[in-house]
């Protein structure tokens, strides 16, 4: 049975004091037993403190990015070894903002996936179409190509370390949200694409999260769809009560 997951991507928000405050709220408010695995992804500078604070809780911690190299002269970058050495064993890769703002290509993201898996990290792999792709009817092709280029090269045994996060880019930070029916349609397509490539066992086990402006008001309906296994949450993850409402919507 595949896992339900709610992951909060904090992006470039929360300084050290604010991070501690939000973590304290989440620890106090999120029940010890939930139907979903709960993960938060603070900024790099607050990861070590977050990992230490959450160590004996049921809340997991993730990095928002990692460099593809093992180490070396890469000013400003963070390696997988550095992350795992502080107890961070999950990483978000391929996020639409990394693709658009920092020009990360499918090939680069695939290299990052390989590096993370080499260090036994869980990868939350993000992918999804832009508005022009959906308007032109090309959204299924775009999603399939990003999947194939990003993760279809990995060995079957590595799929237990992969979580997929479908991001309709046109519904991120815009206030727009794919309808629950649109989300289910794409998630079903994604699962079927994986089934054709890797077989039913992997397709049925991989968790596919929805990552397009999930809020307390729409979470329950989106999460009720059979192929939606949770969410990658942005803005709503920055307020404890909003994030709690989304976590408990599963």
UniProtKB/Swiss-Prot annotation:
Q: Subcellular location, in the record's words?
A: Cytoplasm
Tree of life domain? Bacteria
As one GO molecular function, the record gives: triose-phosphate isomerase activity
Reactions catalysed, as given in the entry: D-glyceraldehyde 3-phosphate = dihydroxyacetone phosphate
* UniProt enzyme class: isomerase
Keyword Nucleotide-binding part of the UniProt annotation: no
Protein's pathway: Carbohydrate biosynthesis; gluconeogenesis; Carbohydrate degradation; glycolysis; D-glyceraldehyde 3-phosphate from glycerone phosphate: step 1/1
UniProt EC number: 5.3.1.1
Q: Name one GO biological process term.
A: glycerol catabolic process
Q: Gene3D superfamilies given for it? A: Aldolase class I
Active-site residues per Swiss-Prot or TrEMBL entry? 95 (electrophile), 167 (proton acceptor)
Note the InterPro entries from the entry.
Aldolase_TIM (IPR013785), TIM_sf (IPR035990), TrioseP_Isoase_bac/euk (IPR022896), Triosephosphate_isomerase (IPR000652), Triosephosphate_isomerase_AS (IPR020861)
Instruction: Name one cellular component (GO) term.
Output: cytosol
The alphabetical list of record keywords is:
Cytoplasm, Gluconeogenesis, Glycolysis, Isomerase
User: Do the record's keywords include Hydrolase?
Assistant: no
Q: What are the binding positions for substrate in this chain? A: 9-11, 173, 213, 234-235
Member of which family?
Belongs to the triosephosphate isomerase family.
> What binding partners and quaternary form does the record give?
Homodimer.
Protein role = Involved in the gluconeogenesis. Catalyzes stereospecifically the conversion of dihydroxyacetone phosphate (DHAP) to D-glyceraldehyde-3-phosphate (G3P).
User: NCBIfam families recorded for this chain?
Assistant: tim
Protein name according to UniProt: Triosephosphate isomerase
Q: Which organism is it from?
A: Flavobacterium johnsoniae (strain ATCC 17061 / DSM 2064 / JCM 8514 / BCRC 14874 / CCUG 350202 / NBRC 14942 / NCIMB 11054 / UW101)
Gene name for this UniProt entry = tpiA
């Amino acid at each position: 049975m595949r896992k339900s997951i709610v992951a909060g991507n904090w992006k470039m928000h929360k300084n050290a004091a604010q991070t501690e405050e939000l973590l304290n709220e989440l620890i106090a408010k999120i029940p010890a037993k939930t139907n979903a695995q709960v993960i938060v992804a603070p900024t790099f500078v607050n990861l070590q403190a977050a990992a230490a604070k959450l160590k004996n809780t049921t809340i997991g911690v993730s990095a928002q990015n990692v460099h593809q190299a093992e180490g070396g002269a890469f000013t400003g970058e963070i390696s997988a070894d550095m992350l795992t050495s502080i107890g961070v064993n999950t990483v978000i890769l391929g996020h639409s903002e990394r693709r658009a703002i920092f020009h990360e290509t499918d090939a680069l993201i695939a290299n990052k996936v390989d590096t993370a898996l080499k260090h036994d990290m869980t990868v939350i792999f993000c992918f999804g179409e832009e508005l022009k792709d959906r308007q032109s009817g090309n959204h299924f092709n775009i999603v399939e190509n990003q999947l194939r280029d990003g993760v279809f090269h990995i060995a079957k045994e590595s799929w237990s370390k992969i979580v997929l996060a479908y991001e309709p880019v046109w519904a991120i930070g815009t206030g727009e949200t794919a309808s629950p029916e649109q989300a289910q349609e794409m998630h079903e397509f994604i699962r079927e694409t994986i089934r054709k490539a890797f077989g039913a066992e992997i397709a049925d086990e991989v968790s596919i999260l929805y990552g397009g402006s999930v809020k307390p008001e729409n979470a329950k309906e989106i999460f009720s769809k059979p192929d939606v296994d949770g969410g990658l949450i942005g803005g709503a993850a920055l307020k404890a009560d909003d994030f709690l409402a989304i976590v408990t919507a599963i």
